[in-house]
C-alpha cells in the first residue's frame, strides 16, 4: 500500500495558543453532556507525563481534548505510564481491555510495540508520534520537521555565543535526534561558518546525572550555549546550568536551549550579584499536545487519518521557536531564517 503524506493546515493547529498555557496535571473533565463515546489514551515512554517535555505535552493535549468533550479522566481519557520498554505491550493490552479505542504511542521507541498492538487490534486506531509505521490502515504516523526549529535554535545560539563554541547533547542516537543535531549545526554555521559545535550523546533519555556531567564538561571547555535534546537527561543539564550560573555574575551566564515545549520556566535563578535572571535562551517547540488533540478531534468526527504520515512543520505551526530571553538582534535573525525556510529559500538538512 502506498503511503499518503498529509500537510497539516494552520487552521487545524489553531489550538496551539490555548495549549501553550496549559500546565494542569490533574484534569478530571468538566460538567456537562458528554460529547463523544470515543475513549482515548496515551502510552508514554519511560520518561512519563511529568517529564517537562515530550510526554507532558502529549498529556496536556489529551487533557484539553477530554475536558472539551466533557469526559472524565480514567474513564474517557487517560495515560498509561511506561517505566521501561518492557511495559509498552502490557500498557497497550491494558488500554484495550479498558475499552480505549484511540491509542497514542508517545515517542519513536514505541514503534514496534505500536505496530504489533495495531495488528492485534484491527478495530482500534493507533497513532505513533515521532516515527513512521508503514502499510497499516489503523495507524497514523505523526512526524515533525524538528530540523527546521533546530535550525532556528542554531541561529540563536550563534548570535548569543561569546566564545564561538556551542554544544549539543542528544539522548540516544536515532533518526529523530539526528534531525535536531543537523538542523542546529546548519543554523549555527549559517551565521558563523567557523563556529565550533561540540556534539555528544548520553546513550539514554532518562539519566539526568549523565546530562549534568556532560553539561559540566561542555561549559568547562568553553561552550556557553548548550542545546539539550535528550528527554530526562536534560534535567541534569538544567541542574548544572543553574548551579554554575548561581556562582557567576549575571553578565557571565551560560545558556541552555529548551526542547519540545517552552522550557523557560526551568531557567529561573538568582545570580551571584543578586539579580533574578533566566538562562534559557530559546526553546524549540514541538506541538505534540496539539497533534494529539487534532487527531483525536478527527477521529471523533469519523475522519481518522489511518495509513498516512501527518507532517507538522514551521509552515503549518507544528514546530516553532520560543524566543524566551532572545535579544532583538536574535529575534530579527530568527524571523528572517524562519521566513526563508517557509518560503523554500533555505533547505534544512535532516541527515
Swiss-Prot record:
Covalently lipidated residues, kind S-diacylglycerol cysteine: 22
Could you list this entry's UniProt keywords, alphabetically sorted: Cell membrane, Lipoprotein, Membrane, Palmitate, Signal
Q: Which InterPro entries match?
A: BMP_lipoprotein, Peripla_BP_I, PnrA-like
Subcellular location(s): the record lists: Cell membrane
The entry's cellular-component GO terms read: plasma membrane
General function of this protein: Part of an ABC transporter complex involved in the uptake of all common nucleosides.
Its name, as the record gives it, is ABC transporter nucleoside-binding protein BmpA
Amino acid at each position: 500500500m502506498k503511503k499518503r503524506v498529509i500537510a497539516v493546515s494552520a487552521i487545524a493547529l489553531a489550538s496551539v495558543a490555548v495549549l501553550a498555557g496549559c500546565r494542569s496535571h490533574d484534569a478530571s473533565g468538566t460538567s456537562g453532556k458528554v460529547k463523544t463515546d470515543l475513549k482515548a489514551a496515551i502510552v508514554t515512554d519511560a520518561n512519563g507525563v511529568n517529564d517537562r517535555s515530550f510526554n507532558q505535552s502529549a498529556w496536556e493535549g489529551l487533557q484539553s481534548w477530554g475536558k472539551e468533550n466533557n469526559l472524565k479522566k480514567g474513564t474517557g481519557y487517560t495515560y498509561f505510564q511506561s517505566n521501561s520498554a518492557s511495559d509498552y505491550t502490557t500498557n497497550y493490552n491494558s488500554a484495550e481491555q479498558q475499552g480505549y479505542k484511540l491509542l497514542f504511542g508517545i515517542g519513536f521507541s514505541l514503534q514496534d510495540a505500536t505496530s504489533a498492538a495495531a495488528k492485534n487490534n484491527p478495530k482500534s486506531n493507533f497513532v505513533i508520534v515521532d516515527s513512521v509505521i508503514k502499510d497499516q490502515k489503523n495507524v497514523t504516523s505523526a512526524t515533525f520537521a524538528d530540523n527546521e526549529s533546530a535550525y532556528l535554535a542554531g541561529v540563536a545560539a550563534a548570535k548569543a555565543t561569546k566564545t564561538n563554541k556551542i554544544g549539543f547533547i542528544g539522548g540516544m542516537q536515532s533518526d529523530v535526534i539526528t534531525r535536531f543535531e543537523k538542523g542546529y549545526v546548519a543554523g549555527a554555521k549559517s551565521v558563523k561558518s567557523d563556529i565550533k559545535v561540540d556534539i555528544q550523546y548520553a546513550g539514554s533519555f532518562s539519566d539526568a546525572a549523565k546530562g549534568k556531567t556532560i553539561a559540566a564538561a561542555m561549559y568547562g571547555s568553553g561552550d556557553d550555549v548548550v542545546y539539550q535534546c535528550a528527554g530526562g537527561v536534560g534535567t541534569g543539564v538544567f541542574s548544572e546550568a543553574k548551579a554554575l550560573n548561581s556562582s557567576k555574575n549575571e553578565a557571565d551566564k551560560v545558556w541552555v536551549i529548551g526542547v519540545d515545549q517552552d522550557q523557560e520556566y526551568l531557567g529561573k535563578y538568582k545570580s551571584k550579584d543578586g539579580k533574578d535572571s533566566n538562562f534559557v535562551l530559546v526553546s524549540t517547540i514541538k506541538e505534540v499536545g496539539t497533534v494529539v488533540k487534532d487527531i483525536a478531534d478527527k477521529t471523533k468526527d469519523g475522519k481518522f487519518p489511518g495509513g498516512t504520515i501527518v507532517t507538522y512543520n514551521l509552515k503549518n505551526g507544528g514546530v516553532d521557536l520560543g524566543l524566551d530571553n532572545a535579544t532583538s538582534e536574535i529575534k530579527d535573525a530568527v524571523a528572517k531564517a524562519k521566513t526563508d525556510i517557509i518560503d523554500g529559500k533555505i533547505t534544512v538538512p535532516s541527515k
